[in-house]
């Protein structure tokens, strides 16, 4: 294998390490119910109980406060963005932009399909969100950094406006109900969506519009890869 081919295919250690840490964090956060709850009953009355409760609080999600658990999914999506940009640049050496985009669409659409297949009743979990966020990012993957930054903020601002000024926020934050006073109320726009009963069944990770916020971290990941590839450590930090 010649040096050019090696340069094209070699792993980037720091990206792999960051991805590995994110996966470890996901395992830790999702292991609470399986491993840590039995330990809590064992430690009752012990001097270690308070420290253990503080630990389990940090690996749990809460409606209020920001914990360690809340850092893991955004970090993983960030790393996905780094990998997406790397894949675009490497594939672009031998493929046209149209072919490159087609390959990315296929990859992220497959993630969405796999997510829909395995998350029955919990559609908006990790794979689905990553797939949809990736699809949103594909038109922007080759744009200038400034364009990607503006698009990232535009997506998250649009999502926050919908969340704050429509009944979507009520649905997302309060158990899947669009109205606090009328549990049966469903907005007209939602009723017009095919299969809305399934799509709006669980308000997980922001629901159907959640990828509008997740794509911000993914696009920031593409920017981080550009800085890393430029080997400018001061800028990267």
What would you call each of these model-derived segments?
Residues 48-57, 111-115, 188-197:
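Active-site-adjacent bridging/hinge elements
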Residues 70-75, 88-119, 123, 127-137, ...:
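Transmembrane alpha-helical segments and their boundary/interface "anchor" motifs
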Residues 13-16, 27, 67, 104, ...:
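Hydrophobic transmembrane-helix microenvironments that flank and shape a buried ionizable site
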Residues 120-123, 202-209, 235-236:
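Active-site-adjacent structural elements in folded domains
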Residues 146-229:
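Long hydrophobic alpha-helical segments that form multi-pass transmembrane helix bundles
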Residues 73-89, 127-139, 208-230:
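Specific transmembrane alpha-helix
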């Amino acid at each position: 294998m010649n040096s050019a081919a090696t340069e094209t295919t070699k792993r980037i250690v720091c990206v792999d390490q960051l991805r590995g840490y994110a996966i470890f964090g996901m395992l830790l956060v999702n292991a609470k119910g399986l491993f840590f709850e039995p330990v809590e009953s064992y430690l009752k009355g012990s001097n270690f109980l308070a420290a253990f409760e503080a630990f389990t609080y940090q690996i749990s999600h809460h409606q209020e406060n920001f914990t360690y658990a809340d850092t893991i999914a955004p970090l993983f999506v960030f790393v996905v963005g780094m990998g997406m940009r790397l894949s675009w640049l490497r594939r672009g050496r031998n493929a046209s932009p149209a072919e490159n985009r087609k390959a990315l669409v296929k990859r992220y659409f497959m993630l969405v399909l796999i997510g829909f297949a395995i998350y029955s009743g919990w559609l908006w979990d990790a794979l689905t969100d990553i797939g949809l966020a990736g699809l949103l990012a594909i038109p922007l993957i080759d744009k200038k950094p400034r364009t990607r930054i503006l698009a990232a903020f535009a997506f998250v601002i649009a999502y926050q406006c919908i969340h704050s000024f429509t009944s979507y926020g009520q649905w997302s934050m309060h158990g899947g109900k669009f109205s606090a006073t009328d549990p049966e109320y469903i907005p007209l726009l939602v009723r017009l969506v095919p299969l809305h009963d399934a799509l709006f069944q669980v308000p997980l990770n922001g629901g159907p519009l959640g990828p509008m916020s997740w794509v911000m971290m993914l696009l920031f990941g593409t920017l981080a890869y550009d800085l890393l590839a430029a080997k400018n450590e001061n800028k990267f930090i």
